């Protein structure tokens, strides 16, 4: 293939015009507003999935944590739909950009931490020093716990970026191998194509799982601070 290995991460264009507008409008088409809701199978499945996800994530939260339900549901829908749209051929996946993922992770993490310091100041400070710590280990543990706290948003963003990027690069490599082997060995090319199809199905699952994992970890951080 003559394309650059990272060509799938560039902004797509159609007739010289960026098609970002169509990508941005796609979630509103996939998830219609309440005044357009019709009782059909698709809407019923969407509502059932949202209720199941919100119940699983927010059932252990108190009243302060429950106020984050709408934000977390919007977050999982945004990341999930963005990841799925990125699987379309010649499309751009914003979640492969670490800057965007950090832009989501840092404010959400900071919100949970500030909520904890505001409503549970003593409990939040107590996390920096486990109970029963020997006196000579106190300075070291405080530093370690502080570093582990500040690395949480970085871990959130890097996890999402790495998983989505790795999957796209692997699909690109296998797709290139399939085309290269068509004239050399059709049988091997067919086997590689089957592998590509299976990997594509796996990537659909990974796209949804990573959206769920990202939102679930934010929910867990919120639970620890409320």
From Swiss-Prot:
The chain crosses the membrane at residues 5-25, 68-88, 97-117, 136-156, 164-184, 189-209. It catalyses: H(+)(in) = H(+)(out). It is found in: Mitochondrion inner membrane. It is a multi-pass membrane protein. Its main location: mitochondrion. Disulfide bonds: none annotated. Pfam families: ATP-synt_A (PF00119). GO terms for biological process: proton motive force-driven ATP synthesis; proton transmembrane transport. GO terms for molecular function: proton channel activity; proton-transporting ATP synthase activity, rotational mechanism. Gene3D superfamilies: ATP synthase, F0 complex, subunit A (1.20.120.220). It comes from the Eukaryota. One of its GO terms (cellular component) is proton-transporting ATP synthase complex. Keywords: ATP synthesis, CF(0), Hydrogen ion transport, Ion transport, Membrane, Mitochondrion, Mitochondrion inner membrane, Transmembrane, Transmembrane helix, Transport. PANTHER family: ATP SYNTHASE SUBUNIT A. Subunit a, of the mitochondrial membrane ATP synthase complex (F(1)F(0) ATP synthase or Complex V) that produces ATP from ADP in the presence of a proton gradient across the membrane which is generated by electron transport complexes of the respiratory chain. ATP synthase complex consist of a soluble F(1) head domain - the catalytic core - and a membrane F(1) domain - the membrane proton channel. These two domains are linked by a central stalk rotating inside the F(1) region and a stationary peripheral stalk. Component of the ATP synthase complex composed at least of ATP5F1A/subunit alpha, ATP5F1B/subunit beta, ATP5MC1/subunit c (homooctomer), MT-ATP6/subunit a, MT-ATP8/subunit 8, ATP5ME/subunit e, ATP5MF/subunit f, ATP5MG/subunit g, ATP5MK/subunit k, ATP5MJ/subunit j, ATP5F1C/subunit gamma, ATP5F1D/subunit delta, ATP5F1E/subunit epsilon, ATP5PF/subunit F6, ATP5PB/subunit b, ATP5PD/subunit d, ATP5PO/subunit OSCP. NCBIfam families: ATP_synt_6_or_A. Belongs to the ATPase A chain family. This is ATP synthase F(0) complex subunit a. It comes from Rhinoceros unicornis.
């Amino acid at each position: 293939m003559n394309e650059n290995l990272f060509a799938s991460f560039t902004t797509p264009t159609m007739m010289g015009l960026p098609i970002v507008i169509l990508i941005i409008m796609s979630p509103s088409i996939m998830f219609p507003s309440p005044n357009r809701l019709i009782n059909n199978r698709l809407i019923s499945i969407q509502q059932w999935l949202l209720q199941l996800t919100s119940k699983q994530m927010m059932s252990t939260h108190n009243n302060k944590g429950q106020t984050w339900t709408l934000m977390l549901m919007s977050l999982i829908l945004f990341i999930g739909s963005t990841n799925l749209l990125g699987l379309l051929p010649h499309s751009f996946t914003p979640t492969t950009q670490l800057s965007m993922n950090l832009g989501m992770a840092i404010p959400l993490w900071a919100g949970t931490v500030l909520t904890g310091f505001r409503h549970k100041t003593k409990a939040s400070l107590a996390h920096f020093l486990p109970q029963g710590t020997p006196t000579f280990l106190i300075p070291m543990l405080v530093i370690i716990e502080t570093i582990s706290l500040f690395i949480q948003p970085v871990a959130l963003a890097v996890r999402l970026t790495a998983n989505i990027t790795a999957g796209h690069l692997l699909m690109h490599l296998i797709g290139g191998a399939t085309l290269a082997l068509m004239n050399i060995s059709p049988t091997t090319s067919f086997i590689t194509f089957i592998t590509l199809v299976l990997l594509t199905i796996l990537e659909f699952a990974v796209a949804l799982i990573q959206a769920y994992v990202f939102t679930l970890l934010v929910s867990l951080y919120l639970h620890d601070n409320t």
